[in-house]
Amino acid sequence: MAGTYSSTLKTLEDLTLDSGYGAGDSCRSLSLSSSKSNSQALNSSAQQHRGAAWWCYSGSMNSRHNSWDTVNTVLPEDPEVADLFSRCPRLPELEEFPWTEGDVARVLRKGAGGRRLPQFSAEAVRRLAGLLRRALIRVAREAQRLSVLHAKCTRFEVQSAVRLVHSWALAESCALAAVKALSLYSMSAGDGLRRGKSARCGLTFSVGRFFRWMVDTRISVRIHEYAAISLTACMENLVEEIRARVMASHSPDGGGAGGGEVSAEALEMVINNDAELWGVLQPYEHLICGKNANGVLSLPAYFSPYNGGSLGHDERADAYAQLELRTLEQSLLATCVGSISELSDLVSRAMHHMQGRHPLCPGASPARQARQPPQPITWSPDALHTLYYFLRCPQMESMENPNLDPPRMTLNNERPFMLLPPLMEWMRVAITYAEHRRSLTVDSGDIRQAARLLLPGLDCEPRQLKPEHCFSSFRRLDARAATEKFNQDLGFRMLNCGRTDLINQAIEALGPDGVNTMDDQGMTPLMYACAAGDEAMVQMLIDAGANLDIQVPSNSPRHPSIHPDSRHWTSLTFAVLHGHISVVQLLLDAGAHVEGSAVNGGEDSYAETPLQLASAAGNYELVSLLLSRGADPLLSMLEAHGMGSSLHEDMNCFSHSAAHGHRNVLRKLLTQPQQAKADVLSLEEILAEGVEESDASSQGSGSEGPVRLSRTRTKALQEAMYYSAEHGYVDITMELRALGVPWKLHIWIESLRTSFSQSRYSVVQSLLRDFSSIREEEYNEELVTEGLQLMFDILKTSKNDSVIQQLATIFTHCYGSSPIPSIPEIRKTLPARLDPHFLNNKEMSDVTFLVEGKLFYAHKVLLVTASNRFKTLMTNKSEQDGDSSKTIEISDMKYHIFQMMMQYLYYGGTESMEIPTTDILELLSAASLFQLDALQRHCEILCSQTLSMESAVNTYKYAKIHNAPELALFCEGFFLKHMKALLEQDAFRQLIYGRSSKVQGLDPLQDLQNTLAERVHSVYITSRV
């Protein structure tokens, strides 16, 4: 029976190393399908209700005795399940995160566009902002582990971390969002210091705060700005994905339209039913994948062989092929297996199906893959054995092998079903690890890393930098070439073991290139020794003739596993990355170029210099050593190859140290004397040269004898100032300002925002004093939308008189010296007009007014046509009293004021009227009451002409109460123009700070902000267009 059993199985070698993974003649029936699965048919209505077929739910099959019995087991309502999760390690609770609830609310509103969609309640926004923290921690933890390899976090580590944590569909969406943000950022390189990173990327979340959070959580000692942009874009995209799914479930038709408000309960319901979101947003350390809150296993809809009802190319598929296709979906949801052969068969068929449906690798351009078709990923035998260790089930082993009796007693507890990820997730995570290594083979290390991520209570160290050869590439070589490759692998292993006495034999085994041979990662033995800090081996390799300045190649089929960010690195670069100062000194003494490949390479060999890497890490000793050997902190600014670097994440050394908050390193860099090199000017700089020189001279004269900065160093320090302000290192920003580096408006606003949020009012005061040094050409929309809002917020909350006086000076400065816009007259002719002789004349009068006990005679025909107020008054009087009484009493108005108002009506205008100054406001009130717009506007003009420091506050209140907007606007301009002096008056302070203003419905500070914003926009922005 054993022989019969074994004869039905393929060998492990056949299952893992044959051409069936990518060949078209193996598992051919997997491409055939003639019907949907029953499970999908049952769940199609549920998917339609959700509006988007994100996931397909599969029911269990009537299988025989294999791993498919574990699929979609109904989770019993057992309190032990809750107790089980309570014992699982939980994610850390951090106090600070790089967003606020307001930021999340703005992202949710931005996603709605111009459509009228249900709004998220405040509680739902608060709940979502809290749940996002867990997703961020998961991605950050994986990026932190991936960054160990090169002691550096780039966009590649962030993108791989997102793919590890999120499902394929969600990760692809996040990758597209990151690509969009990075593209916008690169295309806006010309506005570098004028706009914030988030504005340049088109993001709502703050890229600067994300960068600072990554530094504070020590994801790596070096953080690239593109890594922060990618992480910001991914988290913002996650909010938009959640919003879209909530909207799809909120409306019956799935289009998102509908009334009402999205509650926190509705949000949680959508997340609990979504297998892509629920596990990611749980508080446990291990990642729950492919399951929703009910424990239902799920498969991505786009991966399902039955998705969309697509049929195979052979319509005559037999029943066996249909059954095989149906079982494939169940196979991917298996949580345990009974034998290594079964696992090998499942993995092989799944890989074949994946490569058939997804010919393009995620994140790679179709054009590049058309030139270099992607090779299929294979699984090494040790990877399958390791995976089987985590998926094996003793009971199923006994069922698979009739010769194996089940154990009478077990020494180990089986993991509960809720803790078992499906096979699909094991494969997804392991393949992602292999792809991050640029390897075509999944090895046992990838499986161990996946187990650490997917299972609770497991841990292992991150992958270390060591020689690795692509095992699958050997199979594509002939016997002789494969032998040479294995010998080369042996030579690297001999050198990697640390025995210097084997160096000659190892060099002989490496092949014709000898000690300069490169492995699949494009690295030489000297690079590995430098990364490991092995001084003895480095010295031996140098003595053996190793090339010190050889670079990691850019793109080469001979080296398929090169990490994209390591291209053009030299041995010195690796030593600096890992902080081995003794090895750095050894290489420099031996003649290694201190700038790495930045000078020796060709035009396409962009790479960060060792000094840039040391500056980013804050390694003071390394920076000092490299500077003493002639490293140039301004090398990137000089553009040695004559090409821009906006696509290369380029930052100069000053920027690296400032961005990471290393003040001591920045100070050390500043001690380096300026080199006497001719400044290369752009056309914009040539045209603005006169203005900038005068500005720079004025800046330098205010400081205590600083050395005059060259144009190149000024530009570099201004860039460093930008990064320190964006990332919240206000002390570094102020220190650079003290050197005479001129302000950019955005840098000033960010520094003020940080200082205010930290309640550092001494810095706030210093910044406010320095506002006048910013050139008016810098004033832009950011000053209108953010700068003024920030300054008025400070004015509302500050109790420091000095700060308040500085703000008043700034507001007056921004308002400008030009006069306040005058109030225009209303040229309006009255519809009817009588001779002035009839004014208060009893003759022919048909209506009488009683004002202060005195009668005033008038004529209806004139009054009714003068305003709707008079017409309504006449109509109401006739209906109430009939013709018995024609006297209308006017209260709360003086007789002579009423008389002047009537004089305006009978004279037909204001030309012949003489209005005493003391009566202007009362006449304005009367004109407003009786809706005489022209008279009211004339009174507003008279008030504006007589406005003084003493009467301004009272006039403003009158204008607000009696609906005189033009006069109120004029008063606000008067306030802004004389604000510093007005702040000395109690009446003005009571107006802007007192509670009585709020009781009266006044918000003078908001009105002042709006008026100043319009003024700045018209004077400084619109006029330049």
Swiss-Prot record:
ANK repeats: 521-550, 567-596, 606-635, 649-678
GO biological process entries: cellular response to toxic substance
Molecular function terms, GO-annotated: protein heterodimerization activity
Pfam families recorded: Ank, Ank_2, BTB
BTB domain mapped to chain residues: 845-914
Highest taxon listed in the record's lineage: Eukaryota
Family annotation (InterPro entries): ABTB2_BTB_POZ (IPR048063), Ankyrin-BTB/POZ_domain (IPR052089), Ankyrin_rpt (IPR002110), Ankyrin_rpt-contain_sf (IPR036770), BTB/POZ_dom (IPR000210), Histone-fold (IPR009072), SKP1/BTB/POZ_sf (IPR011333)
UniProt entry keywords in alphabetical sequence: ANK repeat, Repeat
Keyword Repeat applies: yes
SUPFAM superfamilies named among the record's database cross-references: Ankyrin repeat (SSF48403), Histone-fold (SSF47113), POZ domain (SSF54695)
Keyword Repeat: yes
Function: May be involved in the initiation of hepatocyte growth.
UniProt name for this protein: Ankyrin repeat and BTB/POZ domain-containing protein 2
Organism: Homo sapiens (Human)
